[in-house]
C-alpha cells in the first residue's frame, strides 16, 4: 500500500469510534449541502458533484434522513445557517505547503481554529495565493484491488483509455487521476468495463512533492492530522511525499 493510501486507511480506522463517526457525518453532510448549492439541484442525476457526495455518505453508512436534511439545507429550505466553502493556506514544518478546504457557518471561528492549529504545531498560516499555485484541481478515482481479480496492468490500461492522465498502482489500490471536468466520463467508462470503484472525488493535487528530513516530515504529518481533526475542515492537501515508511514511523 502506498504511503498516501496507508495514511487515509489509518485516518478512516480512527474515525470508527462514535465521537469521530459523528464528526465524519457532519463533514459528509456539509459536502452534500455545498454540492447541492453549487450544483443548483438536489437531484443527483442532474448534479454530478452531489451524486459523488451522496455515494460517499452511503459508503460510510450515513442515514438517509441525514442526507436528505443536508440536501434541503443546500436548497435553502432549512432554518439552519448557510454553509460556505473556504480555502486556507499555509506552511508546515520543513516548508511543506498545506492547502485546507473548509465548510463553515462561521468564518471567524474557522479562521481562528485553523490559525491556532498552525501556530501550535510548528506551522505558519499564509495569505490567499501563497501556496495554492502549487496545486491543481483533479479528479481522483480509487479502485480497491482486493475487490477484483483483474490484473492491475489491465486496469491501468483501461484507465488510460478512459481518459486518465496518471495512474498509481500499489499492492492494494489503484489511484486514477484525471481532469476534474472529465471525472464523470472516466468514472462511467470504467464502470461500463466492470471496474469496481470504491471512491471518486474532486481533489487538489500537488504539482510536485517534497521530502524534508524525517523530523520535519513527521511534524508536518502531525500538523496535517490536527488540521483534519478540526470540525470545519473537510480536506487537507499538501506537497509532502507521504511514504509508507513515514506513515509507519508516525503510527508507531
UniProtKB/Swiss-Prot annotation:
Keyword field contains Transcription: yes
Record GO terms (molecular function): DNA binding
SUPFAM superfamilies with a match to the protein in the record: YebC-like (SSF75625)
Pfam families, per database record: TACO1_YebC_N (PF20772), Transcrip_reg (PF01709)
Stretches the record annotates as Disordered: 1-22
UniProt key word Cytoplasm: yes
Entry's Gene Ontology BP terms: regulation of DNA-templated transcription
Location within or outside the cell: Cytoplasm
Recorded superkingdom: Bacteria
Keywords from the named record: Cytoplasm, DNA-binding, Transcription, Transcription regulation
Gene3D superfamilies: 1.10.10.200, 3.30.70.980
One GO CC term on file: cytosol
Comp. bias (Basic residues): 1-14
Similarity annotation: Belongs to the TACO1 family.
Name used for this protein in its record: Probable transcriptional regulatory protein Cagg_2594
UniProt organism field: Chloroflexus aggregans (strain MD-66 / DSM 9485)
Amino acid at each position: 500500500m502506498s504511503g498516501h493510501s496507508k495514511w487515509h486507511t489509518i485516518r478512516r480506522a480512527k474515525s470508527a469510534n462514535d465521537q469521530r463517526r459523528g464528526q465524519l457525518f457532519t463533514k459528509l453532510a456539509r459536502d452534500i449541502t455545498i454540492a447541492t448549492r453549487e450544483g443548483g439541484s438536489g437531484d443527483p442525476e442532474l448534479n454530478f458533484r452531489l451524486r459523488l457526495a451522496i455515494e460517499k455518505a452511503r459508503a460510510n453508512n450515513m442515514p438517509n434522513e441525514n442526507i436528505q436534511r443536508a440536501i434541503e439545507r443546500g436548497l435553502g429550505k432549512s432554518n439552519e445557517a448557510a454553509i460556505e466553502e473556504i480555502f486556507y493556506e499555509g506552511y508546515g514544518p520543513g516548508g511543506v505547503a498545506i492547502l485546507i478546504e473548509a465548510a463553515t457557518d462561521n468564518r471567524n471561528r474557522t479562521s481562528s481554529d485553523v490559525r491556532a492549529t498552525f501556530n501550535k504545531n510548528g506551522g505558519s498560516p499564509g495569505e490567499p495565493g501563497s501556496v495554492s499555485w502549487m496545486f491543481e484541481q483533479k479528479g481522483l478515482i480509487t479502485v480497491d484491488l482486493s475487490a477484483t481479480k483483474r490484473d492491475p496492468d489491465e486496469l491501468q490500461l483501461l484507465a488510460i483509455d478512459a481518459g486518465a492522465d496518471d495512474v498509481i498502482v500499489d499492492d492494494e489500490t489503484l489511484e486514477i487521476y484525471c481532469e476534474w471536468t472529465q471525472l464523470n466520463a472516466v468514472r462511467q467508462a470504467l464502470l461500463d468495463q466492470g471496474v469496481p470503484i470504491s471512491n471518486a472525488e474532486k481533489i487538489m493535487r500537488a504539482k510536485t512533492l517534497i521530502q524534508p528530513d524525517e523530523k520535519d516530515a513527521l511534524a508536518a504529518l502531525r500538523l496535517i492530522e490536527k488540521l483534519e481533526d478540526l470540525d470545519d475542515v473537510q480536506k487537507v492537501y499538501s506537497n509532502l511525499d507521504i511514504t509508507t515508511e513515514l506513515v509507519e514511523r508516525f503510527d508507531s
